[in-house]
Amino acid sequence: MLQIAKLCLATSGRITAQRYVAVTTARAIDQKWREAKGLPENPNAFGPLTNLPDYTFLDGRPTPLGSNQKKRLERQQEIATKIVELSGELEFAKQRYERQRVAAATEKQRIIQNKLKPKGHLMLKQKK
């Protein structure tokens, strides 16, 4: 929609109009409402229209997967395997950190026990 913003009278007696065209578009979907309701930003990205088959057989046969549905399932399987792999690495890192912490504590204790000991009559007093 074009709006006439200004009308200018020129010295020659002609009327000239300057037009301003808006280049930004308003969002058609209320994103704040969708976020508050826990819905995805794009309503076509997830839901029964995208996840369920387009048709079903009346005799109960399974419906073949659509091309995008198959790609989506493969992508989700890749993500799931990556999650399992990374969680395993995280558990390994936690156990390794705990082993290193215990080893450092025992090394510190060993160093303290091997320090110089008192000699002579001080050593004899400690044994009693």
Swiss-Prot record:
InterPro entries: Ribosomal_mL52 (IPR034596). This is Large ribosomal subunit protein mL52. GO terms for molecular function: structural constituent of ribosome. Residues 1-28 form a transit peptide. Disulfide bonds: none annotated. Component of the mitochondrial ribosome large subunit (39S) which comprises a 16S rRNA and about 50 distinct proteins. Belongs to the mitochondrion-specific ribosomal protein mL52 family. Its main location: mitochondrion. GO terms for biological process: mitochondrial translation; translation. It is found in: Mitochondrion. One of its GO terms (cellular component) is mitochondrial large ribosomal subunit. It comes from Drosophila pseudoobscura pseudoobscura (Fruit fly). Keywords: Mitochondrion, Ribonucleoprotein, Ribosomal protein, Transit peptide.
